[in-house]
Amino acid sequence: MSVRIEHDTFGEIEVPGDKYWGAQTERSKRNFPVGKERMPIEVVYGFAQLKRGAALANHELGKLSDAKKDAIVYACDLILKGELDEHFPLVVWQTGSGTQSNMNVNEVVSFVANKYLKEQGIDESIHPNDDVNKSQSSNDTFPTAMHVALYHEVETKLEPALKHLRDTFKEKEDKYQSIIKIGRTHLQDATPIKLGQEISGWRYMLDKCEELLAESKKHILSLAIGGTAVGTGINAHPEFGNKVAKFISENTGYNFVSSENKFHALTSHDEVVQLHGTLKALAADLMKIANDIRWLASGPRAGLAEISIPENEPGSSIMPGKVNPTQCEMLTMVAVQVMGNDTTVGIASSQGNFELNVFKPVILHNTLQSIYLLADGMQTFNDNCAVGIEPIEENINNYLNQSLMLVTALNPHIGYEKAAQIAKKAHKEGLTLKESAIQSGHVTEEQFEEWIKPEDMVDPH
């Protein structure tokens, strides 16, 4: 393998000849052979948006020549097209400020930009620190790239998947408004409910999560850029942060702004904690929904079996013909992982000692993982399970007709205690509710038929 010699303030080091990174990236590769979790490419794209905006801002402020600005923008655009992904090899488990990933981007951008200048016959050279990282510090660039990446992934991946599943439940909700089934509380029989009403609860959970997500992602639009090392903005023009935010906004279509307090932006990640809290809320709702669906689909002959769900693959290596609710199991595992990630994000975000939080990569890694798991999980759950939910009306009607909790409709007519006696007698003696009610002497057959109407119980108003 061919190599070339690169150098940094520690001296010279060999770098693979076909790779565009430089000395600091190579040192990080050697110093941190930890785990297999690569720094997410999405944050590299966030960095590319930032470096692009920084070049335009520095140029506008008279700190960067036309040629250097054009070369840096060219290199960043190549990164954003996904053409340079192989040149970003670093793992999550590195310095807590993300300095090495910032330098990885600086080095690749400078390498590509210098090639561009040479091809254009321009006698200038671009330095990773002095030009690509001009007016910046890893301490304000990494959190900026974090926010750019997180906002984009919520906008383009999570929200569409959430809406997709929500729309499916809305369709099922409307379709099954005429099917009346027994409700359940405490895992015990309760008063009747429409299947459409039950599904409406699931749909509304996703509506609320959509609202919470829209609110929490607003705070991710605030960028740390301009704070440089400790929030004072040393070595940066006072307008640098505002200009970079403007250029990033123009290129992404999102309304990013420069944070009004850079000291906060470097040492606190409460905006991400809030965002991940919303992800946890969504995970909790998805856990509940998936559990409800697999319980309602349990069976086929010794479970509830009120609904059927698609049969996607064999469920057992030993029991022939067995089919399992695998999509529900997948989604509940996703929910558990997201809840665990929330703990990590919360603890990591509490570690902002003095002027800098140095747990940034793990905060980013866990939050992005949660976004991807939830987005992919909802999409596949929708396509392979939710769209195929169908009622098993024979079982639904049998449970409804056998339920003792229909007795609740007698409360206004004979009182709670007499109604309770009727239900207990029916259960103890194996009677139908109607038989027990008539035997009690408190209710005639005609009154029972008039008062016990499940269709009235699901729409009492």
From Swiss-Prot:
Site (Important for catalytic activity) residue list: 329
Pathway in which this enzyme or protein is active: Carbohydrate metabolism; tricarboxylic acid cycle; (S)-malate from fumarate: step 1/1
PANTHER family assigned: ASPARTATEAMMONIA/ARGININOSUCCINATE/ADENYLOSUCCINATE LYASE, FUMARATE HYDRATASE, MITOCHONDRIAL
Catalytic residue list: 186 (proton donor/acceptor), 316
Keyword vocabulary terms for this entry: Cytoplasm, Lyase, Tricarboxylic acid cycle
Oligomer and partners: Homotetramer.
Summary of the function given for this chain in its UniProt record: Involved in the TCA cycle. Catalyzes the stereospecific interconversion of fumarate to L-malate.
Organism for this UniProt entry: Staphylococcus haemolyticus (strain JCSC1435)
Taxon lineage: Bacteria, Bacillati, Bacillota, Bacilli, Bacillales
Family from the record: Belongs to the class-II fumarase/aspartase family. Fumarase subfamily.
Compartment(s) where it occurs, according to its Swiss-Prot or TrEMBL record: Cytoplasm
Catalysed reactions, as listed in the record: (S)-malate = fumarate + H2O
Pfam families tied to this protein: FumaraseC_C, Lyase_1
Additional comment: There are 2 substrate-binding sites: the catalytic A site, and the non-catalytic B site that may play a role in the transfer of substrate or product between the active site and the solvent. Alternatively, the B site may bind allosteric effectors.
UniProt record, GO biological process: fumarate metabolic process; malate metabolic process; tricarboxylic acid cycle
The keyword Cytoplasm belongs to this UniProt entry's keyword annotation: yes
Binding site for substrate: 97-99, 127-130, 137-139, 185, 317, 322-324
Protein name: Fumarate hydratase class II
Entry's EC annotation: 4.2.1.2
Main localisation: cytoplasm
InterPro entries hit by this protein: Fum_hydII, Fumarase/histidase_N, Fumarase_C_C, Fumarate_lyase_CS, Fumarate_lyase_fam, Fumarate_lyase_N, L-Aspartase-like
GO molecular function: fumarate hydratase activity
Any one GO cellular component localisation term in the record: cytoplasm
